[in-house]
A protein has these predicted regions:
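Structural signal for conserved beta-strand scaffold positions within catalytic alpha/beta enzyme cores
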Residues: 32, 102-104, 158, 189-192
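Short loop/turn motifs at secondary-structure junctions
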Residues: 4, 50-51, 123, 152, ...
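Catalytic-core segments of class I nucleotidyltransferases/pyrophosphorylases
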Residues: 128, 147-151, 179-216
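Well-ordered alpha-helical segments embedded in enzymatic catalytic cores
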Residues: 38-41, 113-117, 189
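Conserved beta-strand segments of alpha/beta enzyme cores
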Residues: 29, 99-101, 186
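Conserved beta-loop-beta/alpha segment of the NTase-like Rossmann-fold superfamily
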Residues: 74-78, 85-178, 211-213
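Short glycine/proline-enriched turns and hinge-like loops at secondary-structure junctions
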Residues: 22-23, 168-169, 201-202
Length: 216
C-alpha cells in the first residue's frame, strides 16, 4: 500500500481572459464568491479531504494569491484594536488553513505543463489536482471519495459529471466502461470537445484529479 495522499496541486497561472474586464488587474482566482475569493474555497476543499500540503502553480501578476494566504499584520492589529473578533478570526483562518507552497509556470504552456511543474514537490507520492474553475459543493465530499477510490484500485482517478448531450462540444468527454461500483467507471479514452453527434458519452471531465506519480 502506498503512502497516504497528503499533497494537493492547484494550477492558477492562467490569464483569466474569459472573465475580462474583471480580471484585467485581479487574478480570476481572487474573484469573490459570496464573502471570500474563489481560490479559498478550493484550498478549503483540499484541506477538508485531509490534504494540508498545498502547492499552487502561479504566474506573473498573481501575487495577490500568495498575499491572501499570508499574514496581514497591519490589518490584524487594526481589527484587534477595534475588537472586531469575527473578522480577525476570518483572516487568520485563511492564513493558517494549509501549508502553502508556490511555484511559477514561467511559460503559459497549458494545464499539463503546469502540473508538471509540481514534480519536484510531489516526488514519488500520489497527489490531487484541483482546478479553480470548478467549485464543488463541500457536502458532496467528492475529493474524499476520489481518494478512497484511488486507495482501493491503486489507479489515477478523474472526476466526471453528466452533461446535456447537446453541450458535449464544451467539455472533454470520456469513453467509459461500467464497473461493479455505481459511482465508478473505467475510462478507456478521452475526446476533447467533440461535436454532440460524435461524442462517445455525455460524461464530462471536471477539474478534480487524483493522480499517481508516474504520470509525471
Amino acid at each position: 500500500m502506498g503512502m497516504p495522499i497528503s499533497k494537493a496541486v492547484i494550477p492558477a497561472a492562467g490569464l483569466g481572459t474569459r472573465f475580462l474586464p474583471a480580471t484585467k488587474a485581479m487574478p480570476k482566482e481572487m474573484l469573490p464568491v459570496v464573502d471570500k475569493p474563489a481560490i479559498q474555497y478550493v484550498v478549503e476543499e483540499a484541506v477538508n479531504a485531509g490534504l494540508h500540503d498545498v502547492l499552487m502553480i502561479t504566474g506573473r501578476n498573481k501575487n495577490a494569491l500568495e498575499n491572501h494566504f499570508d499574514r496581514a499584520t497591519e490589518i490584524e492589529a487594526q481589527l484587534e484594536k477595534k475588537g472586531d473578533t469575527r473578522r480577525l478570526q476570518e483572516i487568520l483562518h485563511s492564513t493558517h488553513l494549509a501549508n502553502m507552497h508556490y511555484v511559477r509556470q514561467l511559460d503559459p504552456r497549458g494545464l499539463g505543463h503546469a502540473v508538471l511543474r509540481s514534480q519536484m514537490h510531489v516526488g514519488q507520492e500520489s497527489f490531487a489536482v484541483l482546478l479553480g474553475d470548478d467549485l464543488i459543493d463541500p457536502r458532496d465530499a467528492l475529493l474524499e471519495r476520489m481518494i478512497e477510490i484511488h486507495d482501493t484500485h491503486f489507479a489515477s482517478v478523474v472526476a466526471l459529471m453528466e452533461v446535456d448531450p447537446s453541450q458535449t462540444h464544451l467539455y472533454g468527454i470520456a469513453t467509459v466502461e461500467e464497473t461493479d461500483e455505481s459511482d465508478v467507471v473505467r475510462i478507456t479514452g478521452l475526446v476533447e470537445k467533440p461535436d454532440p453527434k460524435d461524442a462517445p458519452s455525455s460524461l464530462a471531465v471536471i477539474g478534480r484529479y487524483v493522480l499517481q506519480p508516474d504520470i509525471l
